[in-house]
């Protein structure tokens, strides 16, 4: 049985390599590339503008499938080293109902946009080192099988080290104001038994008409009033798991999957807020997650 599973897995990954090659070939069509603010919570697309910082405070309120409801928080700082290369650091914590607030750990990430200009498929490679503990619950991604609610004692979870290396292949494209983004996610354990879990993030987003028009070459246009629909962006984000090395693919009710509308509001070119009410789609997903965030960008061009 084990050899059969490995054969199926090998065929799946061979097919996946073929799809990646097709994506690389499609990505050879050039255009113009602009740095913008990433609107999603889990899906990643745009690099941070060169010599600019993006600071984000993110919080999730989650109705737990198992155990007590909880709130999680993530503080993130990212820096654009070059127009194509971004580095960042993230720290997270959580508060489970009836338990004390707990530190979840730290993440270090970097991602490189492979081309200087815009392509049919803008291809980015992403890597993230995660030094977390067993109580870390923020949904930066979901992967593998089963739920992620805390079912063991908090004191034990806090002492359990969870170190992983996350990799993503990111593709996105803009058609005017519309952005489409897809992330293929792999999480590799840096501790025994060193297996890998897989997941995905998919998003479609209409950028605010004010910023969309500015990016299209109308940067001198007057800013809209503080309360204006032209400052509102909206879209849809879906995230989920794709199994592991032994069973890769959709096993729907054994994996977490979430979908929800995402909204952003740009108070200025520096400040933005975002909101996503997401619902769980499977038997092991949390029923509801309210995702919130505030972002601030500053640097040489802000």
Segments from the language model and where they lie:
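N-terminal secretory signal peptides that target proteins for export/translocation
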Residues: 1-15
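A ubiquitous, low-specificity "background" feature that marks scattered single residues
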Residues: 13, 21-23, 44, 243
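Transmembrane beta-barrel domains of Gram-negative outer membranes and organellar outer membranes
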Residues: 35-302
């Amino acid at each position: 049985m084990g050899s059969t599973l490995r054969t199926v897995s090998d065929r799946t990954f061979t097919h996946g390599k073929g799809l990646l090659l097709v994506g690389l070939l499609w990505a050879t069509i050039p255009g113009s590339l602009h740095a913008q603010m990433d609107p999603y919570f889990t899906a990643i697309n745009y690099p941070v503008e060169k010599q600019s910082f993006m600071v984000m405070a993110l919080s999730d309120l989650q109705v737990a499938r198992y155990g007590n409801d909880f709130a999680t928080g993530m503080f993130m700082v990212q820096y654009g080293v070059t127009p194509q290369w971004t580095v960042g650091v993230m720290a997270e914590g959580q508060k489970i109902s009836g338990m004390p607030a707990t530190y979840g750990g730290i993440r270090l990430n970097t991602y490189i946009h492979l081309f200087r200009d815009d392509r049919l498929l803008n291809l980015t490679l992403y890597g993230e080192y995660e030094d977390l503990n067993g109580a870390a619950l923020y949904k930066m991604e979901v992967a593998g099988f089963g739920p992620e609610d805390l079912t063991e004692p908090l004191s034990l979870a806090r002492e359990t080290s969870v170190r992983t290396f996350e990799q993503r292949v990111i593709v996105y494209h803009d058609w005017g104001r519309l952005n489409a983004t897809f992330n293929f996610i792999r999480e590799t354990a840096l501790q025994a038994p060193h297996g890998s879990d897989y997941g995905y993030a998919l998003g479609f987003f209409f950028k605010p008409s004010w910023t969309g028009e500015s990016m299209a070459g109308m940067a001198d246009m007057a800013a809209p009033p503080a309360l204006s629909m032209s400052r509102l962006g909206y879209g849809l984000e879906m995230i989920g798991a794709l199994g592991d090395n032994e069973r890769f693919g959709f096993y729907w009710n054994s994996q977490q999957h979430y979908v929800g509308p995402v909204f952003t509001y740009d108070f200025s070119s520096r400040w933005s807020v975002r909101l996503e009410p997401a619902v769980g789609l499977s038997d092991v997903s949390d029923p509801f997650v309210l995702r919130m965030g505030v972002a601030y960008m500053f640097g040489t061009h802000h």
